[in-house]
């Protein structure tokens, strides 16, 4: 109950009834009158019961909720108070003094002054100074406890260097001072009843001194707990119990020994690397060595709770340590990365602190096998976050793990990047979305209180680097790394929280960086005082070693034996690493598909056509909806139109997509289509999810209703994010090659907000990390007068990143047999601009039937979705048909090649513009139009065929994009390498260079179109009067 609502219960019965009746429709009181009555009620109640004013009301609301659940859970005086409120007591009548029994002594009130009636009827108020004071004091204690729960983290001892305050504020919040409540030294030994919203003692009451000490021990030492921003009382109480309950954080001697051994591995590993390779960059973990025990504790606890697959995303710092001591990648394999060895595999490879791995091993605590994958990633901080989440979601999907009980993400962050990178919030925002949730990740922040050389006061505007987590309701646990036992407790709570509530949680390891940004960097230039202190600071291992020796947990001999044992392990691994003669990139696969490549001929491309009966059945289903389903009238016409297209043997783009998806689904292949508005389609062509017009949330997906045993079709509208969602779908595509995963941009122009994923992961992922992906990017593209932000998917950028040489030696290359398959095998990705429904159908099916996986960048159409010429006959989908890399001229010019004056190569929608213009200017016999449907790998063989067919013709490349954009700079050297043997060269016909992708003026757009057509057909612009593309 909100404060005003509760207070209104104290108003006169007539006002209460008026308000109740107004809200239930029994009265005609206007909204303004209702507000006036409410305000009067609040004022009257506060006047007679002053403890309802100010911040006290927040606590009273919580106590009222607790009382509704269990009246005995609150103080007897509050029980009587709430009973009287419920019974309709007016202002000044609800409060009663506490009873003489039970609590009178504790509250310092005489029994005579504390007599109270607890019947349900309103009682006469006993207005004694003692009773008012007792309840006032009681409330002050409750508010004091709440203040520590809310603000205690602000004064916690979090910085292991003792220099900074983790929240960038050295002041003490006034509400944590006794004087704020009118309390002082005189009250320290008075005993107070504990409220139901704390668990600091098993007793019902404590002295103020004891209360203060417990609160400081819990909230103000080496752990700072942020959780009062959660809007769920059950979650708040859950966290309180795990931090406030006495002795809850204590470890056994055996647990302390395990922690000590893990600290040895973490610390001595870095020291060993520093000794052997002092001038090598490795981005070590010195200053936050406790990260390794922390991660292992999260994995131990989560494994015990049922998780058996962990996907880790992390930056470069500490990566080698994680690979060695969390994943248990063989040490010799890691150490060999420091040697200058020849790679055994193709590809560029990557630096050692970017590499991923996938390991399966026994977890000793749970005695279960667990799989741990560290996802390879670039130096672009936080870019890996959504990739990890997508991989987790896919693993859970294929395992039938609907609630991610067995699959979990662990994301590591740096403090500056966590606060600074927008993709962090984009990724957080996916967490509760039905088709993207992974049901909670554990975030661990390596908070070394500096970003390269930037002070945190210059790198964030919020108090903590973790404040982004407050937006989505994460509990946040700040912990000083010099208290490893506190870190272990926090990690246990984090694992338990994720299991219980399936929500994200943040562990903020407040630490330092012992060296510079890397081992060769000099930090004293910019942080002299901090690094003077660091030089004087012992390692966490040294401090914890002293602690366990002082506590008698271990003796000197035990410590020495453990240190010697791990030192020997490192030296043996070093000796073995010297015997390694080459580096195997395949040792660092984060998503291995070993079974997929077995018994597959990498140079054999199966046919992608399907049987006629399948075509009819899929289109039939795609055109129907269930009986009793209230479909929009406009969609009824659309569905009938699909059936008619089948009868007319003329299928449109939506049917081509549906046939690709439906045929794969019937073969048991999982299809996932994701992006903004993909269910309907940005241009309202798809309608894969039908909505009942009368029943909210009632939907029908016809492609999920094709046949029994079919693959699942997931078509999901995404959040308005490109960066995180594309990264998510990339991670999803990495898990199972027997799937079709597609991301569609709302407009291709917007894909550049995901440029980091495109550049660092998709275009180069296989070369760097031997990681294949069949992800498809659909990027709506086409110049239709819609301005610079709704015209171009920037094809020039994607083509520039293709790994294909633009020169070809015709004497050494044979354009036959396996040429097409070899090109596909060798390329880093496929770039296409299809013009027919049949071709997009074949391209999508080919993504799954190929014996390997390659990303595909497809410049998809807008106006062609409904263009009457952009149709395909049924036979183009049938068995024996395949993707056409080049679609040759099939009209009159193809019948008389010697008469052809010009051959115009093009790609995409502009073809249909040129067909219309060719007819308009009467050039249908002497200008041949050839469509290049697949730009990369470039179809040298088929382009050569067309050039040879029209030996005497002039060769042009036409495009609607500006000269410095589009495919021109990509195709020119390639076509010329084919023509050079005949002494010919291709010419350009299109728009002039420009800084802007397109004009926003409709008139200018039409003039540019006519200018382009004038160049294409060699006619004056006057001949194009009246032409409309």
UniProtKB/Swiss-Prot annotation:
It is found in: Mitochondrion matrix. The keyword Mitochondrion applies. Its cofactor is thiamine diphosphate; Mg(2+). One of its GO terms (cellular component) is mitochondrial membrane. GO terms for biological process: generation of precursor metabolites and energy; glycolytic process; protein folding; tricarboxylic acid cycle. Mg(2+) binds at residues 415, 448, 450. Thiamine diphosphate binds at residues 317, 415, 448, 450, 676. Pfam families: 2-oxogl_dehyd_N, E1_dh, OxoGdeHyase_C, Transket_pyr. The keyword Transport does not apply. GO terms for molecular function: metal ion binding; oxoglutarate dehydrogenase (succinyl-transferring) activity; thiamine pyrophosphate binding. Keywords: Glycolysis, Magnesium, Metal-binding, Mitochondrion, Oxidoreductase, Thiamine pyrophosphate, Transit peptide. Its EC number is 1.2.4.2. Its main location: mitochondrion. It is an enzyme of class 1 (oxidoreductase). Gene3D superfamilies: 3.40.50.12470, 3.40.50.970, Multifunctional 2-oxoglutarate metabolism enzyme, C-terminal domain, TPP helical domain. It catalyses: N(6)-[(R)-lipoyl]-L-lysyl-[protein] + 2-oxoglutarate + H(+) = N(6)-[(R)-S(8)-succinyldihydrolipoyl]-L-lysyl-[protein] + CO2. Belongs to the alpha-ketoglutarate dehydrogenase family. Homodimer. Component of the 2-oxoglutarate dehydrogenase complex. This is 2-oxoglutarate dehydrogenase, mitochondrial.
């Amino acid at each position: 109950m909100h404060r005003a609502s509760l207070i209104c219960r104290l108003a006169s019965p007539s006002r209460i009834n008026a308000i109740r009746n107004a809200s239930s429709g029994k009265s005609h009181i206007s909204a303004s009158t209702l507000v006036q009555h409410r305000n009067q009620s609040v004022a009257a109640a506060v006047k007679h019961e002053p403890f309802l004013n100010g911040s006290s009301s927040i606590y009273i609301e919580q106590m009222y909720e607790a009382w509704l659940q269990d009246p005995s859970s609150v103080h007897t005086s509050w029980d009587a108070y709430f009973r009287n409120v419920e019974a309709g007591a007016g202002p000044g009548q609800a409060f009663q003094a506490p009873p003489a029994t039970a609590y009178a002594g504790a509250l310092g009130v005489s029994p005579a002054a504390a007599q109270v009636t607890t019947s349900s009827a309103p009682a006469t108020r006993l207005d004694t100074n003692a009773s008012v004071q007792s309840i006032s004091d009681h409330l002050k204690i409750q508010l004091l406890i709440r203040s520590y729960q809310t603000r205690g983290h602000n004064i916690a001892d979090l910085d292991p260097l003792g220099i900074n305050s983790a929240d960038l504020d050295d002041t003490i919040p006034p509400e944590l001072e006794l004087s704020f409540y009118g309390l002082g030294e005189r009250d320290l030994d008075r005993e107070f009843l504990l409220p139901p919203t704390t668990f600091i003692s098993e007793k019902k009451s404590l002295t103020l001194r004891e209360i203060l000490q417990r609160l400081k021990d819990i909230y103000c030492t080496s752990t700072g707990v942020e959780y009062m921003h959660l809007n769920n009382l059950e979650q708040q109480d859950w966290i309180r119990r795990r931090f406030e309950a006495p002795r809850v954080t204590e470890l056994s001697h055996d647990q302390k020994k395990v922690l000590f051994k893990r600290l040895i591995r973490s610390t001595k590993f870095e020291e060993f690397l520093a000794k052997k390779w002092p001038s090598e960059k490795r981005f070590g973990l010195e200053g936050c060595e406790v990260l390794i025990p922390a991660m292992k504790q999260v994995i131990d606890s989560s494994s015990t709770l049922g998780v058996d697959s962990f996907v880790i995303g992390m930056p470069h710092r500490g990566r080698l340590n994680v690979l060695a001591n969390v994943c248990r990648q063989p040490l010799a394999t890691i150490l060999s990365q420091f040697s200058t060895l020849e790679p055994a595999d193709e590809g560029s490879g990557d630096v050692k602190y970017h590499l991923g791995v996938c390991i399966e091993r026994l977890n000793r605590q749970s005695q279960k096998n667990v799989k741990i994958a560290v996802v390879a990633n670039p130096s672009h901080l936080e870019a890996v976050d959504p990739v990890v989440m997508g991989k987790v979601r896919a693993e859970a999907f294929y395992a039938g793990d609907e609630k991610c009980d067995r699959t979990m993400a662990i994301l590591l962050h740096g403090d500056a990047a966590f606060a600074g990178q927008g993709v962090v919030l984009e990724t957080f925002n996916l967490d509760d979305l039905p088709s993207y949730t992974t049901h909670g990740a554990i975030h661990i922040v390596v908070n070394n209180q500096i970003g390269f050389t930037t002070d945190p006061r210059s790198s964030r505007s919020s108090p903590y680097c973790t404040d982004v987590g407050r937006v989505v309701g994460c509990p946040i646990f700040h912990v000083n790394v010099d208290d490893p036992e506190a870190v272990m407790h926090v990690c246990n709570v984090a694992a338990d929280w994720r299991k219980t509530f399936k929500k994200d949680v943040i562990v903020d390891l407040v630490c330092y960086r012992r060296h510079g940004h890397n081992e060769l960097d000099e930090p004293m230039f910019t942080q002299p005082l901090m690094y003077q202190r660091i030089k004087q600071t012992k390692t966490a291992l040294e401090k914890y070693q002293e602690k366990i020796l002082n506590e008698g947990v271990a003796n000197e001999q035990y410590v020495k034996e453990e240190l010697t044992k791990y030192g020997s392990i490192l030296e043996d691994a070093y000796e073995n690493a010297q015997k390694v003669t080459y580096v195997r990139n395949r040792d660092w696969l984060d998503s291995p598909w070993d079974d997929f490549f077995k018994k597959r001929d990498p140079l054999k491309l199966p046919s992608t056509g399907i049987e006629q009966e399948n075509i009819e059945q899929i289109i039939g289903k795609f055109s129907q909806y269930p009986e009793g389903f209230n479909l929009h009238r406009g969609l009824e016409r659309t569905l009938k139109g699909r059936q008619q297209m089948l009868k007319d043997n003329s299928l449109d783009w939506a049917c081509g997509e549906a046939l690709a998806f439906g045929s794969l689904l019937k073969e048991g292949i999982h299809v996932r289509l994701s992006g903004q508005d993909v269910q309907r389609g940005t241009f309202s062509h798809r309608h894969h999810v039908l909505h009942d017009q009368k029943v909210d949330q009632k939907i029908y997906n016809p492609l999920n209703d094709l046949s029994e045993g079919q693959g699942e079709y997931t078509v999901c509208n995404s959040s308005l994010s490109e960066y995180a969602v594309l990264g998510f779908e990339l991670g999803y595509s990495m898990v199972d090659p027997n799937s079709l995963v597609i991301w569609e941009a709302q407009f291709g122009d917007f894909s550049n907000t995901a440029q980091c994923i495109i550049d660092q992961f998709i275009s180069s992922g296989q070369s760097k990390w031997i990681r294949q992906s069949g992800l498809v990017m659909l990027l709506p593209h086409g110049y239709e007068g819609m301005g610079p932000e709704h015209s171009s998917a920037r094809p020039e950028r994607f083509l520039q990143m293709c790994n294909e040489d633009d020169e070809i030696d015709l004497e050494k290359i044979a354009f036959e047999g396996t040429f097409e398959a070899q090109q596909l095998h060798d390329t880093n990705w496929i770039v296409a601009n299809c013009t027919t429904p049949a071709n997009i159908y074949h391209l999508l099916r080919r993504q799954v039937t190929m014996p390997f996986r390659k990303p595909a960048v497809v410049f998809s159409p807008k106006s062609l979705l409904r263009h009457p010429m952009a149709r395909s006959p049924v036979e183009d989908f049938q068995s024996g048909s395949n993707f056409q890399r080049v679609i040759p001229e099939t009209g009159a010019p193809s019948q008389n090649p010697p008469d052809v004056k010009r051959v115009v190569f093009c790609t995409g929608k502009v073809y249909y513009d040129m067909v219309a213009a060719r007819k308009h200017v009467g050039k249908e016999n002497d200008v041949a139009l050839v469509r290049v449907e697949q730009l990369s790998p470039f179809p040298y063989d088929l382009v050569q065929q067309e050039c040879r067919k029209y030996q005497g013709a002039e060769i042009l490349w036409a495009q609607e994009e500006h000269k410095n954009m589009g495919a021109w700079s990509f195709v020119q050297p390639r076509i010329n390498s084919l023509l050079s043997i005949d002494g010919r060269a291709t010419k350009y016909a299109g728009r002039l260079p420009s800084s802007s992708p397109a004009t926003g003026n409709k008139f200018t757009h039409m003039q540019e179109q006519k200018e382009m057509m004038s160049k294409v057909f060699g006619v004056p612009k006057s001949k194009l009067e009246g032409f409309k593309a």
